[in-house]
């Protein structure tokens, strides 16, 4: 057995006692939360620890000292009510009484299933509740009839405690909650007729805590602020799925930052990961641009799978995100960014941040020139991988700061050819491979390389919106050179000179005094 297992302790004649916290509907005492608690490993120690905790719970329960623990664990007790059913809730907590939308997925009857057993299963079928019909799409409820659901927001000066879990949920408890709703609003939101209905309550306690509970009501007539002649009342446990609640587990930023509009150019290996992770990070207004379609040869280094082959990458990513990540607005454009800018389908000034994830130096140089020539003050993040994972690079460039993207390039004194000064791969080598002739070349690197670049990007995006960056930056992550050597390619002098795994250069350090775009430090 589990040597760390606590001993279960039950209360005899539990139904004869007053209703008290930390005892479930079968009389078992809830002794400890296992998370963060050190439990004695020997049996006598476990017994003593458990008995002392049981004594404390009962003593505080009889005296009423721990009554407010009901408030801290309201939903836990609600879940133990008889016939409690799961409901998934994705609505805005905007403090308004209103009608929201919902649906119940129909459960098919099994071939040899008795009707009474089928009815029991149907009563446990999950319910899905959203702000509107559009918000229900995340649960694939296309063929499910949509219901109007009453949503009431309650503020109480006194604590509202969960009902006694040893008894069925009563009509009196329901009506006590309905009495908090103004009669006029109640009549307009909840139908008076004797039809099945669902009611959701957002309960605000005096302590500032908020609880979400619901009820499935069969029959009943509304009279003033009470329901009468209810045939059946079933408690609903609300599993919250709204963005505000879900983001509590992951958010590290001010929620206002997530409203920033971000333009991402390129939906390939790096861009695809960046777009998905920006959505997961909570950013809710993304515009993504890419004129290419997803092909089979990209599958093993792209976030999307075979399901999306031969679709435009930007549109496929939108479909994928809308299926999996709630409350993200994505605008797609299957067009070359140069054409989109010239035709004004895209206006850089409309965004708070631009991310270029194409890995195409020539395109990035074009974007950089357009930004600086037009004195656009929207910051730009450029991302690119190097061949065989020898390096990952992220650059932050903002007009008005020293240095620009063009500063990363110089000309060979002997040949006059342009080369990339940031590269960890020695210049003059052929680093591309062919996938079938002219126009089908690519730079070889794996999915892990793109993930590393994506992580550098996300950290930079966070720093930008938290206003932590004062200078233009180039961040370079040095990779292993094993694969490079296996393919008979040589490393650059920069790779040899760099001792650190990550090298950060400011604009003043990487600026090219002969740059014809930023003119050193934008004239400063």
Task: Map each language-model feature to its residues.
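Glycine-centered motif in EGF-like
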Residues: 14-70
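Glycine-rich phosphate-binding loop and adjoining beta1-alpha1-beta2 segment
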Residues: 291-327
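Conserved acidic residues
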Residues: 334-337
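Short, small-residue-biased leader/transition segments that mark boundaries at the very start
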Residues: 3-4
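Short amphipathic alpha-helix with an adjacent loop that forms part of the alpha/beta core around
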Residues: 340-349
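N-terminal charged helix/coil linker that caps or initiates catalytic domains
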Residues: 209-262
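Glycine-rich phosphate/adenylate-binding loop
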Residues: 69, 73-222, 349-353, 357-524
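Glycine-rich adenosine-cofactor-binding loop
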Residues: 253-293
């Amino acid at each position: 057995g589990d040597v760390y297992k606590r001993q279960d302790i039950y209360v005899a004649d539990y139904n004869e006692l007053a209703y008290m916290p930390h005892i479930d509907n079968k009389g078992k005492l809830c002794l400890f939360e296992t998370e963060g608690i050190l439990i004695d490993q020997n049996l006598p120690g476990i017994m003593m620890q458990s008995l002392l905790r049981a004594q404390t719970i009962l003593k505080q329960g009889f005296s009423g000292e721990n009554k407010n623990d009901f408030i801290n664990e309201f939903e836990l007790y609600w879940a133990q009510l008889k016939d409690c059913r799961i409901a998934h809730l994705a609505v805005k907590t905007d403090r308004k009484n209103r009608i929201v939308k919902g649906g119940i997925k129909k459960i098919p009857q099994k071939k040899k299933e008795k009707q009474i057993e089928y009815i029991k299963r149907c009563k446990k079928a999950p319910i899905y509740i959203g702000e509107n019909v559009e918000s229900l799409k995340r649960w694939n409820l296309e063929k499910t009839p949509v219901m109007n659901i009453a949503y009431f927001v309650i503020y109480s000066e006194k604590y509202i405690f969960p009902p006694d879990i040893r008894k069925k949920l009563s009509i009196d408890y329901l009506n006590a909650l309905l009495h908090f709703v103004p009669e006029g609003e109640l009549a307009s939101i909840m139908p008076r007729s004797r039809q099945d209905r669902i009611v959701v309550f957002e309960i605000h306690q005096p302590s500032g805590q908020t609880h979400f509970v619901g009820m499935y009501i069969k029959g009943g007539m509304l009279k003033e602020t009470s329901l009468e002649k209810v045939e059946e009342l079933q408690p609903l446990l609300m599993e919250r799925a709204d963005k505000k609640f879900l983001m509590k587990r992951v958010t590290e930023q001010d929620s206002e930052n997530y409203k920033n509009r971000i333009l991402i150019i390129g939906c390939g290996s790096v861009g695809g990961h960046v777009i998905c992770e920006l959505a997961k990070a909570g950013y809710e207004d993304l515009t993504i641009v890419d004129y290419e379609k997803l092909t089979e040869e990209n599958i093993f280094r792209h976030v999307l799978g075979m399901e999306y082959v031969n679709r435009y990458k930007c549109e496929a990513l939108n479909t994928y995100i809308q299926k999996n990540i709630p409350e993200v607005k994505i605008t797609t454009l299957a067009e070359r960014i140069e054409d989109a800018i010239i035709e004004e389908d895209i206006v850089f000034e409309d965004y708070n941040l631009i991310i270029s994830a194409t890995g195409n130096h020539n395109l990035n140089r074009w974007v950089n020139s357009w930004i600086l020539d037009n004195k656009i003050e929207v910051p730009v993040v450029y991302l690119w991988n190097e061949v065989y994972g020898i390096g990952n690079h992220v650059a932050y460039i903002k007009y008005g700061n020293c240095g620009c993207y063009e500063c990363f390039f110089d000309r060979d004194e002997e040949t006059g050819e342009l080369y990339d000064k940031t590269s960890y791969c020695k210049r003059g080598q052929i680093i591309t491979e062919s996938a079938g002739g002219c126009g089908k070349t690519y730079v070889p690197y794996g999915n892990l390389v793109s993930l590393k670049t994506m992580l550098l990007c996300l950290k930079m995006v966070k720093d930008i919106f938290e206003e932590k960056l004062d200078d233009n930056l180039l961040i370079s992550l040095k990779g292993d050179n094993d694969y490079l050597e296996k393919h008979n390619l040589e490393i650059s002098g920069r790779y040899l000179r760099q001792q650190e795994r990550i090298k950060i250069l400011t604009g003043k350090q990487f600026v090219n005094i002969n740059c014809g775009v930023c003119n050193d430090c934008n004239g400063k």
